[in-house]
Amino acid sequence: MNRLTKYAVCALAGLAATHVSLAATVRVSGDNTWKVFHDGELIAEAADWQAPTVTEFDVDKNGRALIAIYVHDAEPGGAGVGGMLADIILDDGTVIPTAEDEPGWVCDVGDPIADRDDDWETVAFDDSAWIPLTFYDQFGLGVWAGGTAVMTARFGDPEVEAFWSWCMPNNETDEVYFHYRIGSLAVESEGKLATAWGALKDSR
């Protein structure tokens, strides 16, 4: 093996060792209506919490992407409760559900989406002041348990382990926004430092 061939083999081996996820799927349900954005682009929307959306998307060459979700609760205030359930599945099989042990999920409340013009759904938006989610029942339990069978069929594999969530009490807020940054975690108001996706995966 000459020096040039040896270099090429080593370079290819290095690329294989540093593979980053370049494809992913996001599965979402919201009560009552929702929109899903990937790096600022609308990729899914629906209005039936028992009919979740399952959408493929790409991440950039560094393995980074922003998933931004808006959910509207149609019953104002205490007349009803809102909920959002989601997970992100990377091409290596890693699953990132809405759950307490996935600190990258953050949220905010605000005006209806039609009245919001601050580019909240884009990668450049500063979400450092957003707060952790409030979690309720795990999928298949609680208020939304009645739709489990239908939703499971639509979700497909793998099994959903996410929890229904909201931003602050779900009988008080009706216009809610969510972020998850693949590749890094948002800086939270408590002062948590940004964490590289590689380090997050290594901790699993």
Feature locations, PLM:
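Sec/Tat signal peptide C-region and signal peptidase I cleavage site
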Residues: 17-23
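Short, surface-exposed beta-strand/strand-loop-strand elements in extracellular ectodomains
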Residues: 33-43
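Exposed beta-strand and adjacent loop surfaces of beta-rich binding modules
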Residues: 23, 33-35, 85
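Bacterial N-terminal signal peptides that target proteins for export
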Residues: 1-11
